[in-house]
Curated annotation (Swiss-Prot):
Protein name: Ribosome-recycling factor
Keyword Coiled coil assigned: no
Classification of source organism: Bacteria, Pseudomonadati, Spirochaetota, Spirochaetia, Spirochaetales
UniProt cross-references to Pfam families, sorted A to Z: RRF
Recorded GO MF terms: ribosomal large subunit binding
Length: 184
């Protein structure tokens, strides 16, 4: 029974970490350099995260400065930002890109919350898939007479209880992100 708990905890922890990582790329009221983690730049034929080919700094509350390590990448970085879903318009001075970030409108904040909700739902499905996988494994062990029917019932109940707990954590992470997005 402990093996199921350990396996469930391991897989669900990965689900939660992945959710938090994906939420970092959503734009909120606060500017964060992790916004650019998912922006991919064509770097010698390879799609490379922007943060690996340039220094991203935030010198002021509403200003982002992107300084590429290789000046020849400036136009490619600019194109990558323009084609991303960040809705940002960089301006170049030949050495660095500057992005003046406008305050998010209420409508845009609501769109981002919808996007965050959709992401949370996808991760709840992933959590349920982990539950289903472990349930199948336990049922197979019972079918092969490796565990008793009572053990199976106990294992399935434990898996369900723990899955509910992890789904609640996903909801808590979503609620925190919603609060952060709607904060002015």
């Amino acid at each position: 029974m402990e093996e199921y708990k350990a396996l469930l905890d391991e897989k669900m922890s990965k689900v939660l970490l992945s959710l938090e990582s994906e939420y970092k790329s959503l734009r909120t009221g606060r500017i964060n350099s992790s916004l650019f983690d998912k922006v991919l730049v064509d770097y010698y034929g390879e799609k490379t995260p922007l943060t690996r080919v340039a220094n991203v700094s935030i010198p002021e509350a509403r200003l982002i400065v992107i300084q590429p390590w290789d000046k020849s990448l400036l136009s490619k970085i600019e194109q990558a930002i323009l084609s991303s879903d960040l809705s940002m318009n960089p301006s170049s001075d030949g050495a660095v890109l500057r992005i003046k970030v406008p305050v998010l409108t209420v409508e845009r904040r609501k769109e981002i919350v919808k996007q965050a909700k959709k992401i949370a739902e996808e991760y709840k499905v992933a959590a349920r898939n982990v539950r289903q996988e472990l349930n199948s494994k336990a049922k197979k062990q019972e079918k092969d007479s490796q565990i008793t029917e009572d053990d199976l019932r106990r294992i399935l109940d434990d898996i369900q209880r723990d899955t509910n707990s992890y789904i609640k954590k996903i909801d808590e992470i979503f609620d925190l992100k919603t609060k952060e997005i709607m904060e002015v």
